[in-house]
């Protein structure tokens, strides 16, 4: 299996307790929208029983020159190390894996259901399909507790506003604990939505 070295360009908070890590895409690294890959820390300052490798969905689409990985920041050695890594830090990435992708028949709509951080493969799939003008009608349902927890909510709303083929339906299940005004859907994803 081929492994590549990748360099951290920047890290940013994209929702409450959620960070995105942007890496320069290595030469020759090719993937399909919706795939994932193993990221391995190189000589981390600490480790735990879970080890130094994690599998992440690739949140960026293939047409971009960067690889973006998004995660909820939990208290593990891996995430503490990643969360404090400086620009220029190097990690290893394995070959892309998985066959989670948009079907090829544009006559059939693509309907995607995501919860929380599970939005990451759909970020790649939807942005690639919109850029390619795939012709698919796309319906992306995304459930979160609160808008504060919804990674890339604003970006997906903007993409949907620009592309008539994409309908983005975010819904919030815990607005009683939110400090933000929300006028969209509430409750779990249902057939009626």
Regions found by a protein language model. Name each.
Residues 2-89, 144-146, 171-174:
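Ferredoxin-reductase
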Residues 74-193:
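FNR/FR-type flavoprotein reductase catalytic core
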